[in-house]
UniProtKB/Swiss-Prot annotation:
Activity control note: The formation of the proteasomal ATPase PAN-20S proteasome complex, via the docking of the C-termini of PAN into the intersubunit pockets in the alpha-rings, triggers opening of the gate for substrate entry. Interconversion between the open-gate and close-gate conformations leads to a dynamic regulation of the 20S proteasome proteolysis activity.
Organism: Thermococcus kodakarensis (strain ATCC BAA-918 / JCM 12380 / KOD1)
Family: Belongs to the peptidase T1B family.
Localization annotation: Cytoplasm
Signal in keyword set: no
Name by which UniProt lists this protein: Proteasome subunit beta 2
GO CC terms in record: cytosol; proteasome core complex, beta-subunit complex
Function: Component of the proteasome core, a large protease complex with broad specificity involved in protein degradation.
Pfam families, per database record: Proteasome
Gene: psmB2
Length: 199
């Protein structure tokens, strides 16, 4: 019998940068394993990915991307852009389509320009202004579609991202709604925070 897991991660791109947000609950079937897991992983000081799917697969991909980013920096003397990293990850996923990494990833970063992309397990790549992944994504994307504006500030995007994850957590039993991990990436760098709710 298959065990059900789930999560919700979202990303929003603005003119000022990128906001990534995710719940912090790890679940396995009907059991909550922890309420304190990080689902947004930094790859460089300007690029991060969100995790939905197999934790081991995402961790392996994150290690590959970190190594590729360091190699790129060493070879070319400049950081890899988030767009280039998204294309690289798309190729890695597509090369493994017969034995796929069971992941759905959002990649966000600010190297030269704010970039946000969504990747499916087979390497399908979509660049967008906002996106959501995981079992709660249908609920989160509805909130994002309703609240997104092209001219929104990073602070407004952060509030919208938290609201989207929290809404998903209220409707999707596999998404937590008590704590939201938020990563904001701008030209000034990357900042992480956790937004907690008592109820």
């Amino acid at each position: 019998m298959e065990k059900k897991t789930g999560t919700t991660t979202v990303g929003i791109r603005t003119k000022e940068g990128v906001v990534l947000a995710a719940d912090t609950q790890a679940s396995l079937d009907h059991m909550v394993e922890t309420l304190n897991i990080r689902k947004i992983l930094p790859i460089t000081d300007r690029i991060a990915i969100t995790t939905a799917g197999s934790v081991g697969d995402v961790q392996a991909l994150a290690r590959m991307l970190e190594a590729e980013a360091r190699y790129y920096q060493f070879t070319w003397g400049r950081p890899m852009t988030a767009k280039a990293m998204a294309h690289l990850l798309s190729n890695i996923l597509n090369e493994n389509k017969w034995f796929p990494y069971m992941v759905q990833i959002i990649i966000g970063g600010y190297v030269e320009e704010p970039t946000l992309a969504n990747l499916d397990p087979l390497g399908g790549l979509i660049f967008d202004d906002y996106t959501a992944t995981g079992s709660g994504s249908p609920f989160a994307i509805a909130v994002l579609e309703d609240g997104f504006r092209k001219d929104m500030s990073l602070e407004e995007a952060k509030e919208l991202a938290v609201r989207a994850v929290r809404t998903a957590g209220k409707r999707d039993v596999y998404t937590g709604d008590r704590k939201v991990q938020v990563v904001v990436i701008s030209k000034d760098g990357m900042k992480e925070e956790f937004v907690e709710f008592k109820e």
